[in-house]
Amino acid sequence: MTDKTHLDSSLGLRAATWADVHPVADLIYTVCEADGDVTVATTPENLEHAWREDGFDPETDAFVVQTADGRIVGYEELANEQAFAHFSADGYVHPDFKGRGIGTTLMTRAEERALAMMKQAEPDLRVYLHAAADGKDETGQEMFAHLGYQIVRYFWRMEIQLDSAPAFALPTGIEFRPFDRDAHAQLVWQADNEAFREHWGSHDTTFKEWSFRKLERPEFDPSLWLIAWDGSEIAGFSQNRFRMGIGWVGTLGVRKPWRGRGLGLALLHASFADFYRRGMKTVGLGVDASNTTGATRPYQRAGMRIASEFVNFEKELRPGRSLEYE
């Protein structure tokens, strides 16, 4: 890696350490607050959990920029999403320190890390890096354009304020059953992979990966999960949780044989009703605005509005054969 940065002498770049969990989480909250949407921030507990995922090491895959007195004002992490060929970067710059080369320095270091890691990819695979900016963050979007990134997608965070628990009706033959981790986890994992294979940027996860991300996260509550069954088959699911002070529809999916019957909307309304009964009247979710399965339509029909927009960028690091679910 190069030691060259775009920083002035009052700022320094270094690898992250485990001691940085709380200050990095504080930085992320500050940035999201300035962008007007703290629901997409994180807690120290969730950040630490993410850092413990297999294949990620904050001391090699995450970087911070700090002031001379040790205050962290910039953060970037790089994740190997699939096969050392699809990488994603996630970064934050304190609003008082924008325009000082922090974002460019961090993205440059993330790219260098990706270039080193891609040596483990199959030699004919296309290698690319994804990153995103808040739709209101013109500085960040200009930085990505300057670094050679192209806009490839838009994502929305949608939200609804509930004034009552909506009614819902499941399609004939479909019923909810409580989620039993021992009996149902493998089946929900398989249904999750199947339901999202057509989604942009998606790929199958292993059961270990899925369990870590879904069942072992700090705020996991099995009583919030809605699993729709048709006999012995899972037809759809809504993996709900509480997130940063609101109800969150984390992953809502319907398997292809059960699509077009209103199950997606029923799952959404059932999720709203459950949150409302628990005293939570604000519910949000994230969705690909260009989703080919029409995922945004039931959300809009249910009365959800766009609360935030995020611009997804891509940079090709090496041409080649596309990944199976790219």
Spans of features found by a protein language model:
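Conserved hydrophobic beta-strand within the GNAT/NAT acetyltransferase core sheet
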Residues: 89, 129-131, 249, 283-287
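Conserved active-site tyrosine of GNAT-family acetyltransferases
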Residues: 140-144, 299, 304
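Conserved acetyl-CoA-binding loop-helix of GNAT-fold acetyltransferases
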Residues: 99-116, 254, 260-273, 277, ...
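Acyl-donor-binding surface of acyltransferase catalytic domains
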Residues: 1-7, 79-173, 309-315
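C-terminal "cap" of GNAT-fold acetyltransferases
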Residues: 4, 156-177, 281-293, 302-326
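A conserved beta-strand-loop-helix scaffold within acyl/acetyltransferase catalytic domains
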Residues: 35-56, 76-84, 199-254
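Hydrophobic beta-strand residues of extracellular immunoglobulin-like
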Residues: 61-64, 224-227, 269
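Short amphipathic alpha-helix that is part of the acyltransferase structural core
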Residues: 2-50, 169-204, 324-326
